[in-house]
Structures are given as structure tokens and as C-alpha cells.
């Protein structure tokens, strides 16, 4: 079979959620972020597994994701929408019983004109300048909004993966300034914020990348393995080049394995001539450019070339691969393409 295999350990995702739940203050509810189709790993399977583990609050990016997730989860858990109540979202929010995180006075007006008794939350901007009401806007609508009984007031940290960054303390102070004294549950932290300590936990945490084995949660169990089949092995002599642009040249006689995956499968070209693949725990350098459907790998040092080499495995997680590609683990995970044969272990189907 020429199709690469992406193996996903749902039990590891559940174990990572439990670990982050334990890391949160014991009085804190621990939600789960499953946007972007569960970081590319199937939001329905991930969410059902986490619901069985105890998660009751789920977060998605847009209402359309929430509709799909509701079909997978059923009526029980809450599904919160980070983008809030956008124009055209009313039917989806009502039909799938979604909870929009209101980001502006405009969204607040839209929500209460269309769905005056429907649950909602509030998102505040405490310094990231991305989503949420800024302080002046919040001051103008806070009395009305709080009087309608929001389910949650939240913000998001810009630099939580850098524990010593001054922005963390500044955003924490601003969140306190904007919300101290309210009786509504509050949430500031995703994975990185959980690891910053109890001062950042408030009433609910929202782990995302840590569930899927990514930094900054260094204790995470590995979740994915990507095994790519070897199509062909050829001998090369010193001075011969490999791949488009002749960007890799053999320094000595050796062997090149051609593997069946490429940038059409989400393996970004920036990892060309930089990334490693693995035969067990033996590293094999990517030789030449990533092409649409193929990789070429230097296997000169292997006594025997296996039927497949691993790009993601215990020896190389998403963050190590991301470092080679000059990106972040989030991009590696969410780019994994549809051509892979996906095998799920554990969890809930």
C-alpha cells in the first residue's frame, strides 16, 4: 500500500486531558478545545473520548464547527464558539444549542435581538489585540451584559508558552481589573496558562494543544505516529543530486529511499533538507526538496531499509518536527492531509 498511515491514540488524548485537569486547581472546571477538527485528528472522536473522560465544556472556532460537533456529541455537553455570534450564525447557534463568546457590542446587540434568552458568554481583550471587547467597550455594556446572565467571561493569553514573559502578568492584572467582583465564571488559561500556576486558573481552563501532545506541555503522552511507506530504494554515487532543483548532492556513495507522501499531504516544503525520519530510533535525513507526493530520504547508514519510515513517532513529536520546519506544532498537526489511512486506538468511536 502506497498510502501513509496516521495512527492516533485517543487514550493518550484522554490521559493528557486528565493530567491537565489535575494540574488545574481542584475547584476549576477543565474544558477542551477541539477546533480545526480536533487539531486535525477528528473532533467528533476526540470530543466523545474526552466527554467519557469527564469534559463537559468544549470550545470551537466557528459556529459551523459547533454544528458538526453537536451531531457527534449529542445534547449534553456545552459547545462554546470563540468567534461569537457572527452575522448569519443565528440559526446554527439556536439549532445546535451553541454558546457564542460575544466579542463586541455589535455581536451583543445581534445576539439579543435574535436570541434574547439563549446562552452566551463574553470574551474580553486583555492585551492580545485579536478577539474580545476592549476595556472601554466592556465598560459601556458590562451592566447590561452581566444582567443577562452570561455563562462565562473569558480572555486569552498571548505569551503563555513563555513563562517569564511580562505580558502574562500584565494580562492577568488586566483580567482582574475588568472582572473582579462579578459572579460569572471566569476563564483565562489554555494549556500554557494552566502551567503558569493557580493564579491563572480562575473558574475554568481550556486546554488545547497539550491534549494532542504539543508544547508547552512537556509531560504529554505522544498522540500521533505518521508512518510513510518506502516506494523505492536506489543507489547514488558521490556527486549525484536528488530531487527538484538538485538541492541535495551526495557527498559519498550511498542509498536514497523514495517515500509516498509530500506537500499535498501537509508536509510543508520548509522541512526540505532539514527534517529527519526514523527507522525505529535511527534518524534518517530528508534529502532534497519535499515534492507534491514524494519524499527522498538518505538511508545509506541503514543495514536494512524497512517498509516504512516514521515522520512522527516517540523519537520525534510534532514540536521537534516543527522546529526543523521553522514553524509550530499546531501547524504540523492541523496540516495533516486527508490521504492518510487513519487508524484510531482506544477512546470512543
Curated annotation (Swiss-Prot):
GO terms assigned for molecular function: alanine racemase activity; pyridoxal phosphate binding
Alphabetically ordered keywords of this record: Isomerase, Pyridoxal phosphate
Root EC class: isomerase
Disulfide bonds: none
Residue runs in coiled coils: none
One Pfam family in the UniProt entry: Ala_racemase_C
Residues annotated as catalytic: 35 (proton acceptor), 244 (proton acceptor)
Modified residues (N6-(pyridoxal phosphate)lysine): 35
Any single GO CC term annotated in Swiss-Prot or TrEMBL for this entry: cytosol
Pathway of action: Amino-acid biosynthesis; D-alanine biosynthesis; D-alanine from L-alanine: step 1/1
Swiss-Prot/TrEMBL cofactor(s): pyridoxal 5'-phosphate
InterPro entries: Ala_racemase (IPR000821), Ala_racemase/Decarboxylase_C (IPR009006), Ala_racemase_C (IPR011079), Ala_racemase_N (IPR001608), Ala_racemase_pyridoxalP-BS (IPR020622), PLP-binding_barrel (IPR029066)
Binding site for substrate: 130, 292
Catalysed reactions, semicolon-separated: L-alanine = D-alanine
Any GO BP: D-alanine biosynthetic process
E.C. numbers: 5.1.1.1
UniProt similarity note: Belongs to the alanine racemase family.
HAMAP family: Ala_racemase
Function: Catalyzes the interconversion of L-alanine and D-alanine. May also act on other amino acids.
PANTHER family attached to this UniProt entry: ALANINE RACEMASE, ALANINE RACEMASE, CATABOLIC-RELATED
Protein name, entry field: Alanine racemase
Amino acid at each position: 500500500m502506497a498510502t501513509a498511515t496516521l495512527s492516533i491514540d485517543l487514550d493518550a488524548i484522554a490521559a493528557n486531558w486528565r493530567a491537565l485537569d489535575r494540574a488545574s486547581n481542584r475547584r476549576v472546571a477543565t474544558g477542551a478545545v477541539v477546533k480545526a477538527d480536533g487539531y486535525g485528528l477528528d473532533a467528533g472522536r476526540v470530543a466523545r473520548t474526552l466527554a467519557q473522560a469527564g469534559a463537559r465544556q468544549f470550545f470551537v472556532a466557528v459556529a459551523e464547527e459547533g454544528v458538526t460537533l453537536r451531531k457527534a456529541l449529542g445534547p449534553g455537553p456545552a459547545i462554546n464558539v470563540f468567534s461569537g455570534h457572527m452575522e448569519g450564525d443565528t440559526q446554527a447557534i439556536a439549532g445546535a444549542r451553541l454558546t457564542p463568546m460575544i466579542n463586541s457590542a455589535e455581536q451583543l446587540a445581534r445576539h439579543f435581538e435574535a436570541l434574547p434568552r439563549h446562552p452566551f458568554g463574553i470574551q474580553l481583550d486583555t492585551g492580545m489585540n485579536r478577539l474580545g471587547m476592549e476595556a472601554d467597550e466592556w465598560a459601556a455594556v458590562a451592566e447590561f451584559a452581566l444582567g443577562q446572565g452570561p455563562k462565562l467571561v473569558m480572555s486569552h493569553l498571548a505569551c503563555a508558552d513563555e513563562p517569564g514573559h511580562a505580558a502574562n502578568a500584565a494580562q492577568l492584572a488586566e483580567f482582574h481589573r475588568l472582572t473582579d467582583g462579578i459572579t460569572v465564571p471566569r476563564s483565562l488559561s489554555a494549556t500554557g496558562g494552566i502551567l503558569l500556576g493557580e493564579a491563572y486558573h480562575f473558574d475554568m481552563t481550556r486546554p488545547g494543544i497539550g491534549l494532542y501532545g504539543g508544547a508547552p506541555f512537556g509531560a504529554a503522552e505522544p498522540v500521533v505516529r505518521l508512518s510513510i511507506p518506502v516506494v523505492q530504494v536506489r543507489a547514488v554515487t558521490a556527486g549525484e543530486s536528488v530531487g527538484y532543483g538538485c538541492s541535495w548532492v551526495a557527498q559519498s556513495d550511498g542509498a536514497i529511499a523514495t517515500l509516498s507522501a509530500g506537500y499535498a499531504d501537509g508536509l510543508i516544503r520548509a522541512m526540505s533538507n532539514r527534517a529527519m525520519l526514523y527507522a525505529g530510533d535511527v534518524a534518517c535525513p530528508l534529502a532534497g526538496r519535499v515534492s507534491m507526493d514524494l519524499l527522498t530520504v538518505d538511508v545509506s547508514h541503514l543495514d536494512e531499509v524497512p517498509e516504512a519510515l516514521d515522520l512522527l513517532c516517540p523519537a520525534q513529536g510534532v514540536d521537534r518536527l516543527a522546529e526543523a520546519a521553522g514553524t509550530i506544532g499546531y501547524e504540523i498537526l492541523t496540516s495533516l492531509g486527508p490521504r492518510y489511512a487513519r487508524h484510531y486506538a482506544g477512546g470512543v468511536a
